[in-house]
Amino acid sequence: LQPLRASLRAGDLAVQKSTYQTWLTQSLPVYQEKLWNGQYFRLDSDSGSQVVMADQLCGQFYARLLGLPDIVPSDRALSALQTVYHACFVKFCNGEFGAANGVRPDGSPENPNATHPLEVWTGINFGLAAFLVQMGMQDEALKLTGAVVQQIYHNGLQFRTPEAITASGTFRASTYLRAMAIWAIYLVIDAKKHILHSDTNTV
């Protein structure tokens, strides 16, 4: 949905804007109806999976970052973020590693033999942390970031930051660029400081 919003902002042809606006208008209510379960957004509409996906609202983060309208209501975004924080981070290995890509609400794996759902992707975690800051959860963001950074540095990976680390002590995809998302945390914190400074001067 967020790419549609961005396309509407960037599009310079009336036909394109009309098409994208139609798609967006049709999609927004369906997204809520099919995926919202009262606490977080489901992985999909048909499988019945209970998995809490760590980056389920990355589009909402980018929309706010770009100054675009929200994709989902802010109260639902906050509820989903709190669920992600507790399920994927706090309850997953007691918060030692960072947020797993996708686990049940109690932090347990849906499939213990799965690979990607139980990995902690450094870049996804930093993006999630930036979103937490954006939504007023800075303490939680710094705890999450700290856990991931500690895993990287304590395991001697600071000059070969991996894409993924696991609770079993393995890692893969060294020097993966998505970890540069850590700068998004600074970007959001800095933006909040500028807003606060501007408000103070206005008063």
Predicted segments — roles?
Residues 20, 40-41, 176:
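Aromatic side chains
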Residues 2-7, 11, 45-202:
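Active-site core of glycosidic bond-cleaving carbohydrate-active enzymes
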Residues 30-54:
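Short, surface-exposed recognition loops and adjoining beta-strand edges that mediate ligand/DNA contacts
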Residues 1-37, 70-72:
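Active-site neighborhood of glycoside hydrolase catalytic domains
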